[in-house]
Amino acid sequence: MLEAFFWIAVLMVLYTYAGYALVLRLMPKAPRPEITGQFSPPVSIIIAAYKGAGVIKQKLDNTLASDYPRAKLEVIVVTDGSDDGTDTIVERYGDPCVSLIRQVPRAGKTAAQKKGVAAAKYEILIFTDLTTVLESKSIPELVKNLEDPSIGLVSSEDIWVKLDGTTTESAQCAYVKYEMWLRNRESEISSIVSASGCFYAVRKMFFEPIPDYLIDDTVIPLTVAEHGFRCLHHADARSYVPMIPSADREFTRRARMTLGGINALMYKKGLLNPLKYGFYSVQLWSHKMFRWLVPFGLLAALITNARLVSHDPLSFWGIAMLAQLGLYAAAVVGFVRRNQPSTHKLIRLSYFFVSSNLALLLSWYQFVTSGKQTTWSESRGQA
Protein backbone atom coordinates (compact mmCIF):
# COMPACT_ATOMS: atom_id res chain seq x y z
CA MET A 1 0.00 0.00 0.00
CA LEU A 2 2.83 2.42 0.87
CA GLU A 3 4.49 1.65 -2.47
CA ALA A 4 1.27 2.51 -4.30
CA PHE A 5 1.00 5.85 -2.48
CA PHE A 6 4.64 6.61 -3.28
CA TRP A 7 4.24 5.95 -6.99
CA ILE A 8 0.95 7.83 -7.22
CA ALA A 9 2.64 10.87 -5.65
CA VAL A 10 5.71 10.63 -7.90
CA LEU A 11 3.66 10.12 -11.07
CA MET A 12 1.46 13.09 -10.22
CA VAL A 13 4.53 15.34 -9.92
CA LEU A 14 6.07 13.94 -13.12
CA TYR A 15 2.83 14.32 -15.07
CA THR A 16 2.44 17.91 -13.91
CA TYR A 17 5.87 19.06 -15.08
CA ALA A 18 6.61 16.68 -17.98
CA GLY A 19 3.65 14.48 -18.85
CA TYR A 20 1.25 17.31 -19.61
CA ALA A 21 3.84 18.99 -21.82
CA LEU A 22 4.26 15.70 -23.71
CA VAL A 23 0.49 15.42 -24.19
CA LEU A 24 0.42 18.94 -25.65
CA ARG A 25 3.40 18.16 -27.86
CA LEU A 26 1.66 15.13 -29.40
CA MET A 27 -1.74 16.72 -30.02
CA PRO A 28 -2.59 18.23 -33.44
CA LYS A 29 -3.21 21.92 -33.95
CA ALA A 30 -6.79 23.13 -34.20
CA PRO A 31 -7.81 24.87 -37.46
CA ARG A 32 -7.99 28.67 -37.30
CA PRO A 33 -9.55 31.16 -39.70
CA GLU A 34 -7.13 33.36 -41.60
CA ILE A 35 -6.82 36.92 -40.33
CA THR A 36 -5.87 39.89 -42.50
CA GLY A 37 -3.74 41.67 -39.91
CA GLN A 38 -5.54 44.91 -40.74
CA PHE A 39 -7.92 44.81 -37.77
CA SER A 40 -7.36 47.94 -35.66
CA PRO A 41 -10.47 48.98 -33.72
CA PRO A 42 -10.29 51.69 -31.03
CA VAL A 43 -8.98 50.28 -27.75
CA SER A 44 -9.01 51.30 -24.10
CA ILE A 45 -5.73 50.67 -22.27
CA ILE A 46 -6.07 50.37 -18.50
CA ILE A 47 -3.10 50.74 -16.16
CA ALA A 48 -3.64 50.14 -12.45
CA ALA A 49 -0.92 51.89 -10.45
CA TYR A 50 0.14 51.84 -6.83
CA LYS A 51 3.07 54.06 -5.84
CA GLY A 52 4.33 54.31 -9.40
CA ALA A 53 5.87 57.79 -9.42
CA GLY A 54 9.25 56.40 -10.45
CA VAL A 55 7.98 54.65 -13.57
CA ILE A 56 4.60 56.07 -14.64
CA LYS A 57 5.99 58.62 -17.12
CA GLN A 58 8.17 55.98 -18.80
CA LYS A 59 5.14 53.67 -18.94
CA LEU A 60 3.01 56.28 -20.68
CA ASP A 61 5.84 57.17 -23.07
CA ASN A 62 6.32 53.50 -23.94
CA THR A 63 2.59 52.87 -24.41
CA LEU A 64 2.08 55.87 -26.69
CA ALA A 65 5.15 54.98 -28.76
CA SER A 66 3.12 52.07 -30.14
CA ASP A 67 2.63 51.58 -33.88
CA TYR A 68 -1.11 51.43 -33.18
CA PRO A 69 -3.01 54.47 -34.56
CA ARG A 70 -2.84 57.17 -31.87
CA ALA A 71 -6.37 58.35 -32.63
CA LYS A 72 -7.67 54.90 -31.65
CA LEU A 73 -5.97 54.80 -28.25
CA GLU A 74 -7.50 55.66 -24.90
CA VAL A 75 -5.20 55.30 -21.88
CA ILE A 76 -6.79 55.22 -18.43
CA VAL A 77 -4.52 55.28 -15.37
CA VAL A 78 -6.22 54.26 -12.13
CA THR A 79 -4.15 55.04 -9.04
CA ASP A 80 -4.90 52.93 -6.00
CA GLY A 81 -4.47 55.25 -3.04
CA SER A 82 -0.98 56.30 -4.17
CA ASP A 83 0.57 59.02 -2.03
CA ASP A 84 3.91 59.38 -3.81
CA GLY A 85 2.98 61.87 -6.54
CA THR A 86 1.85 59.37 -9.18
CA ASP A 87 -1.44 61.25 -9.64
CA THR A 88 0.32 64.57 -10.26
CA ILE A 89 2.63 63.09 -12.90
CA VAL A 90 -0.33 61.65 -14.83
CA GLU A 91 -2.28 64.91 -14.59
CA ARG A 92 0.67 66.87 -15.97
CA TYR A 93 1.49 64.39 -18.73
CA GLY A 94 -0.28 66.56 -21.25
CA ASP A 95 -1.69 64.09 -23.76
CA PRO A 96 -5.44 64.24 -24.47
CA CYS A 97 -5.76 60.45 -24.77
CA VAL A 98 -4.45 59.94 -21.20
CA SER A 99 -6.87 60.25 -18.28
CA LEU A 100 -6.59 59.72 -14.52
CA ILE A 101 -8.95 58.06 -12.06
CA ARG A 102 -8.15 58.19 -8.34
CA GLN A 103 -9.17 55.28 -6.15
CA VAL A 104 -9.33 56.40 -2.52
CA PRO A 105 -9.08 54.68 -0.12
CA ARG A 106 -6.81 51.95 -1.40
CA ALA A 107 -8.89 48.95 -2.50
CA GLY A 108 -6.55 46.79 -4.63
CA LYS A 109 -5.74 46.12 -8.26
CA THR A 110 -9.00 44.41 -9.23
CA ALA A 111 -11.09 47.26 -7.81
CA ALA A 112 -8.91 49.74 -9.71
CA GLN A 113 -9.35 47.81 -12.95
CA LYS A 114 -13.12 47.74 -12.49
CA LYS A 115 -13.13 51.53 -12.20
CA GLY A 116 -11.06 51.76 -15.36
CA VAL A 117 -13.38 49.45 -17.28
CA ALA A 118 -16.44 51.42 -16.13
CA ALA A 119 -14.87 54.55 -17.64
CA ALA A 120 -13.61 52.88 -20.84
CA LYS A 121 -15.26 54.05 -24.06
CA TYR A 122 -14.28 51.16 -26.31
CA GLU A 123 -15.17 47.48 -26.66
CA ILE A 124 -11.58 46.18 -26.74
CA LEU A 125 -9.78 46.44 -23.41
CA ILE A 126 -6.03 46.13 -22.91
CA PHE A 127 -4.60 45.61 -19.45
CA THR A 128 -0.91 46.22 -18.84
CA ASP A 129 1.20 46.45 -15.71
CA LEU A 130 3.01 49.59 -14.70
CA THR A 131 6.56 48.32 -15.15
CA THR A 132 5.97 46.18 -18.25
CA VAL A 133 7.78 47.45 -21.36
CA LEU A 134 6.19 46.85 -24.77
CA GLU A 135 7.65 46.75 -28.25
CA SER A 136 6.16 49.25 -30.69
CA LYS A 137 4.38 46.42 -32.52
CA SER A 138 3.09 44.67 -29.38
CA ILE A 139 -0.34 46.33 -29.23
CA PRO A 140 -1.20 45.84 -32.94
CA GLU A 141 0.09 42.25 -32.78
CA LEU A 142 -2.15 41.55 -29.78
CA VAL A 143 -5.28 43.22 -31.15
CA LYS A 144 -5.17 41.81 -34.70
CA ASN A 145 -6.10 38.35 -33.41
CA LEU A 146 -9.49 39.67 -32.28
CA GLU A 147 -10.49 39.95 -35.94
CA ASP A 148 -11.48 36.31 -35.46
CA PRO A 149 -14.91 36.55 -33.77
CA SER A 150 -14.36 33.25 -31.93
CA ILE A 151 -11.46 34.76 -29.96
CA GLY A 152 -12.35 36.50 -26.71
CA LEU A 153 -8.91 37.17 -25.23
CA VAL A 154 -5.30 37.40 -26.43
CA SER A 155 -2.31 37.20 -24.10
CA SER A 156 1.30 38.24 -24.59
CA GLU A 157 4.67 36.53 -24.67
CA ASP A 158 6.40 37.46 -21.41
CA ILE A 159 10.17 37.91 -21.36
CA TRP A 160 11.67 38.41 -17.94
CA VAL A 161 14.61 40.81 -17.81
CA LYS A 162 16.91 42.38 -15.24
CA LEU A 163 16.16 45.90 -14.00
CA ASP A 164 18.53 47.30 -16.64
CA GLY A 165 16.50 45.57 -19.38
CA THR A 166 19.03 42.84 -20.20
CA THR A 167 18.03 39.18 -20.35
CA THR A 168 19.13 36.64 -17.78
CA GLU A 169 19.36 32.86 -17.46
CA SER A 170 17.90 32.64 -13.96
CA ALA A 171 15.70 29.77 -12.77
CA GLN A 172 12.70 32.12 -12.81
CA CYS A 173 13.33 32.95 -16.47
CA ALA A 174 13.63 29.27 -17.36
CA TYR A 175 10.28 28.67 -15.68
CA VAL A 176 8.66 31.56 -17.57
CA LYS A 177 9.97 30.19 -20.89
CA TYR A 178 8.47 26.80 -20.00
CA GLU A 179 5.16 28.47 -19.12
CA MET A 180 5.13 30.43 -22.40
CA TRP A 181 5.75 27.18 -24.33
CA LEU A 182 2.81 25.52 -22.58
CA ARG A 183 0.55 28.46 -23.39
CA ASN A 184 1.65 28.51 -27.01
CA ARG A 185 0.78 24.82 -27.42
CA GLU A 186 -2.51 25.22 -25.54
CA SER A 187 -3.35 28.11 -27.84
CA GLU A 188 -2.60 26.04 -30.95
CA ILE A 189 -4.71 23.13 -29.71
CA SER A 190 -7.56 24.68 -27.77
CA SER A 191 -7.36 27.68 -25.44
CA ILE A 192 -5.02 28.99 -22.76
CA VAL A 193 -6.24 28.68 -19.16
CA SER A 194 -4.72 31.91 -17.81
CA ALA A 195 -3.44 35.17 -19.25
CA SER A 196 -0.31 37.24 -18.68
CA GLY A 197 -1.49 39.94 -16.31
CA CYS A 198 1.39 42.07 -17.55
CA PHE A 199 -0.24 42.55 -20.97
CA TYR A 200 -3.39 41.13 -22.55
CA ALA A 201 -6.44 42.21 -24.55
CA VAL A 202 -10.04 41.11 -23.99
CA ARG A 203 -13.45 41.95 -25.34
CA LYS A 204 -15.28 44.19 -22.88
CA MET A 205 -18.31 41.88 -22.89
CA PHE A 206 -16.28 39.32 -20.90
CA PHE A 207 -15.18 41.66 -18.12
CA GLU A 208 -17.73 40.75 -15.47
CA PRO A 209 -17.87 42.50 -12.10
CA ILE A 210 -15.93 40.15 -9.83
CA PRO A 211 -15.08 40.27 -6.11
CA ASP A 212 -12.02 42.41 -5.37
CA TYR A 213 -10.05 39.45 -3.97
CA LEU A 214 -9.98 37.70 -7.37
CA ILE A 215 -7.21 38.34 -9.88
CA ASP A 216 -8.14 39.33 -13.41
CA ASP A 217 -5.59 37.34 -15.41
CA THR A 218 -7.00 34.04 -14.13
CA VAL A 219 -10.73 34.66 -13.75
CA ILE A 220 -11.28 36.57 -17.03
CA PRO A 221 -9.91 33.76 -19.27
CA LEU A 222 -12.16 31.36 -17.35
CA THR A 223 -15.12 33.64 -18.05
CA VAL A 224 -14.24 33.72 -21.76
CA ALA A 225 -14.07 29.91 -21.88
CA GLU A 226 -17.33 29.63 -19.95
CA HIS A 227 -19.04 31.55 -22.76
CA GLY A 228 -17.61 29.24 -25.43
CA PHE A 229 -14.92 31.60 -26.79
CA ARG A 230 -11.19 30.94 -27.10
CA CYS A 231 -8.23 32.58 -25.38
CA LEU A 232 -5.00 32.79 -27.35
CA HIS A 233 -1.32 33.25 -26.61
CA HIS A 234 0.43 35.35 -29.26
CA ALA A 235 4.22 35.02 -29.28
CA ASP A 236 4.79 38.15 -31.40
CA ALA A 237 3.08 40.40 -28.85
CA ARG A 238 6.08 40.63 -26.55
CA SER A 239 6.20 42.23 -23.13
CA TYR A 240 9.39 42.72 -21.13
CA VAL A 241 8.85 42.17 -17.42
CA PRO A 242 11.46 43.27 -14.85
CA MET A 243 12.34 40.54 -12.38
CA ILE A 244 11.71 41.16 -8.71
CA PRO A 245 15.22 41.86 -7.35
CA SER A 246 14.59 40.11 -4.02
CA ALA A 247 14.11 36.34 -3.66
CA ASP A 248 12.01 36.96 -0.55
CA ARG A 249 9.67 39.33 -2.42
CA GLU A 250 9.43 36.85 -5.29
CA PHE A 251 8.37 34.17 -2.78
CA THR A 252 5.65 36.47 -1.45
CA ARG A 253 4.51 37.30 -5.00
CA ARG A 254 4.22 33.64 -5.97
CA ALA A 255 2.18 32.86 -2.87
CA ARG A 256 -0.12 35.82 -3.53
CA MET A 257 -0.61 34.96 -7.21
CA THR A 258 -1.32 31.30 -6.43
CA LEU A 259 -3.84 32.27 -3.76
CA GLY A 260 -5.56 34.44 -6.36
CA GLY A 261 -5.51 31.58 -8.85
CA ILE A 262 -7.01 29.10 -6.37
CA ASN A 263 -9.74 31.59 -5.51
CA ALA A 264 -10.46 32.18 -9.21
CA LEU A 265 -10.73 28.47 -9.98
CA MET A 266 -12.98 27.89 -6.99
CA TYR A 267 -15.11 30.83 -8.19
CA LYS A 268 -15.44 29.11 -11.59
CA LYS A 269 -15.21 25.52 -10.33
CA GLY A 270 -17.85 24.29 -12.79
CA LEU A 271 -15.15 24.48 -15.48
CA LEU A 272 -13.34 21.59 -13.78
CA ASN A 273 -16.05 19.21 -15.01
CA PRO A 274 -14.68 17.39 -18.11
CA LEU A 275 -18.11 15.97 -18.91
CA LYS A 276 -19.28 19.51 -19.66
CA TYR A 277 -16.13 21.32 -20.80
CA GLY A 278 -14.11 18.46 -22.30
CA PHE A 279 -10.41 18.98 -22.93
CA TYR A 280 -10.49 22.48 -21.45
CA SER A 281 -11.25 20.89 -18.06
CA VAL A 282 -8.33 18.50 -18.56
CA GLN A 283 -6.14 21.54 -19.20
CA LEU A 284 -7.31 23.21 -15.99
CA TRP A 285 -6.57 20.11 -13.95
CA SER A 286 -3.21 19.53 -15.63
CA HIS A 287 -1.89 23.08 -15.88
CA LYS A 288 -3.34 24.56 -12.71
CA MET A 289 -4.87 22.27 -10.10
CA PHE A 290 -2.28 19.49 -10.27
CA ARG A 291 0.54 22.06 -10.18
CA TRP A 292 -0.93 23.64 -7.07
CA LEU A 293 -1.16 20.16 -5.50
CA VAL A 294 2.48 19.24 -6.23
CA PRO A 295 3.74 20.16 -2.72
CA PHE A 296 1.36 17.60 -1.25
CA GLY A 297 2.68 15.04 -3.73
CA LEU A 298 6.25 15.85 -2.68
CA LEU A 299 5.36 15.47 1.00
CA ALA A 300 3.60 12.17 0.33
CA ALA A 301 6.60 10.86 -1.63
CA LEU A 302 8.99 11.85 1.17
CA ILE A 303 6.90 10.37 4.00
CA THR A 304 6.13 7.08 2.24
CA ASN A 305 9.75 6.77 1.11
CA ALA A 306 10.93 7.25 4.71
CA ARG A 307 8.66 4.45 5.89
CA LEU A 308 9.74 2.13 3.07
CA VAL A 309 13.47 2.75 3.47
CA SER A 310 13.28 1.93 7.18
CA HIS A 311 12.44 -1.67 6.21
CA ASP A 312 15.14 -2.06 3.55
CA PRO A 313 17.72 0.77 3.47
CA LEU A 314 19.95 -0.88 0.84
CA SER A 315 17.19 -1.29 -1.75
CA PHE A 316 15.76 1.04 -4.39
CA TRP A 317 14.06 2.94 -1.57
CA GLY A 318 17.42 3.96 -0.14
CA ILE A 319 18.47 5.40 -3.50
CA ALA A 320 15.14 7.21 -3.85
CA MET A 321 15.51 8.70 -0.36
CA LEU A 322 19.04 9.89 -1.11
CA ALA A 323 17.78 11.56 -4.30
CA GLN A 324 15.03 13.37 -2.41
CA LEU A 325 17.34 14.45 0.40
CA GLY A 326 19.85 15.63 -2.20
CA LEU A 327 17.19 17.85 -3.78
CA TYR A 328 16.30 19.45 -0.47
CA ALA A 329 19.95 19.83 0.57
CA ALA A 330 20.66 21.61 -2.72
CA ALA A 331 17.65 23.86 -2.07
CA VAL A 332 19.04 24.79 1.36
CA VAL A 333 22.38 25.70 -0.23
CA GLY A 334 20.48 27.72 -2.83
CA PHE A 335 18.60 29.54 -0.07
CA VAL A 336 21.85 30.47 1.68
CA ARG A 337 23.32 31.67 -1.64
CA ARG A 338 20.08 33.04 -3.12
CA ASN A 339 21.56 36.46 -3.81
CA GLN A 340 24.85 35.14 -5.23
CA PRO A 341 24.86 35.14 -9.07
CA SER A 342 27.78 32.68 -9.17
CA THR A 343 25.67 29.86 -7.66
CA HIS A 344 25.61 26.73 -9.85
CA LYS A 345 22.56 26.41 -12.10
CA LEU A 346 21.43 23.10 -10.56
CA ILE A 347 21.56 24.64 -7.09
CA ARG A 348 19.51 27.62 -8.29
CA LEU A 349 16.96 25.35 -9.99
CA SER A 350 16.63 23.21 -6.85
CA TYR A 351 16.08 26.27 -4.68
CA PHE A 352 13.54 27.72 -7.12
CA PHE A 353 11.63 24.43 -7.32
CA VAL A 354 11.47 23.88 -3.56
CA SER A 355 10.76 27.52 -2.68
CA SER A 356 8.01 27.66 -5.31
CA ASN A 357 6.32 24.66 -3.74
CA LEU A 358 6.70 26.13 -0.26
CA ALA A 359 4.94 29.21 -1.63
CA LEU A 360 2.15 26.94 -2.87
CA LEU A 361 1.80 25.45 0.61
CA LEU A 362 1.57 28.96 2.05
CA SER A 363 -1.12 29.78 -0.53
CA TRP A 364 -3.20 26.78 0.54
CA TYR A 365 -2.80 27.76 4.19
CA GLN A 366 -3.96 31.30 3.40
CA PHE A 367 -6.85 29.93 1.34
CA VAL A 368 -8.05 27.73 4.19
CA THR A 369 -7.55 30.31 6.95
CA SER A 370 -8.52 33.59 5.29
CA GLY A 371 -8.85 33.04 1.57
CA LYS A 372 -8.82 36.64 0.42
CA GLN A 373 -6.24 39.31 -0.39
CA THR A 374 -7.16 42.46 -2.28
CA THR A 375 -4.17 44.81 -2.12
CA TRP A 376 -0.77 44.49 -3.71
CA SER A 377 2.63 46.00 -2.97
CA GLU A 378 4.87 48.39 -4.88
CA SER A 379 5.60 47.68 -8.53
CA ARG A 380 8.18 45.17 -9.73
CA GLY A 381 11.66 46.53 -9.64
CA GLN A 382 10.85 49.41 -7.35
CA ALA A 383 12.56 49.81 -4.01
Per-region residue spans from a language model:
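Membrane-embedded multi-pass helical conduit in multi-pass membrane proteins
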Residues: G37, V241, R291-K372
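N-terminal membrane-anchoring/stem segments of glycan-assembly enzymes
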Residues: M1-G37
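Catalytic donor/gating beta->alpha subdomain of glycosyltransferases that bind UDP-sugars
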Residues: D95, L146-E179, D212, D216-H287, ...
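Short aromatic/hydrophobic "clamp" motif used to bind/position activated sugar donors
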Residues: L125
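Short, acidic, metal-binding catalytic loop of nucleotide-sugar glycosyltransferases
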Residues: D61-K72
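Long helical/loop segments within the catalytic core of UDP-sugar-dependent glycosyltransferases
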Residues: T110-A112, S136-L214, F352
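A conserved acidic beta->alpha catalytic loop
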Residues: T79-T88, P105, T132
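Glycine-rich, basic loop-to-helix element that forms the pyrophosphate-binding segment
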Residues: Q103-A120, P140, K177, V219
